UniProtKB/Swiss-Prot annotation:
Gene name of the record: acpP
PROSITE patterns, sorted: CARRIER (PS50075)
Record pathway: Lipid metabolism; fatty acid biosynthesis
The protein's name in its UniProt record: Acyl carrier protein
GO molecular function annotations of the record: acyl binding; acyl carrier activity
Family stated for the protein in its record: Belongs to the acyl carrier protein (ACP) family.
Modification sites for O-(pantetheine 4'-phosphoryl)serine: 37
Function: Carrier of the growing fatty acid chain in fatty acid biosynthesis.
Chief place of localization: cytoplasm
C-alpha cells in the first residue's frame, strides 16, 4: 500500500466510520461503502485538503471508487 492509498483510506475510514482493513480498492463509495451525497462532498473536501489540490466538480463526479481516487491523486502528483 503506497502513501497516497494509505492517506485516502484513512480519510475514508474517518468520514465513513469504516475500519481501514475493510476498505477495498475496488469499493464504490455509494454501493459498497454506503456513502451518501453529503459523505461524498466531505470525502472530496478532505482529499483536497490532505493533498493540497483542487478537484473540479466534473472530476469529483468520476471519483466514485477508492481506486479511482487513488489514481486521480497519483496522476495529479505526477504533473
Amino acid at each position: 500500500m503506497n502513501n497516497v492509498e494509505k492517506k485516502i483510506k484513512k480519510i475514508i475510514s474517518k468520514i465513513l466510520n469504516i475500519k481501514v482493513e475493510k476498505i477495498l480498492n475496488n469499493a464504490s463509495f455509494l454501493d459498497d461503502l454506503s456513502a451518501d451525497s453529503l459523505d461524498i462532498v466531505e470525502l472530496i473536501m478532505a482529499i483536497e485538503e490532505e493533498f493540497d489540490i483542487e478537484i473540479s466538480d466534473e472530476d469529483a463526479e468520476k471519483l466514485n471508487t477508492v481506486q479511482k481516487s487513488i489514481d486521480y491523486i497519483n496522476n495529479k502528483n505526477k504533473k
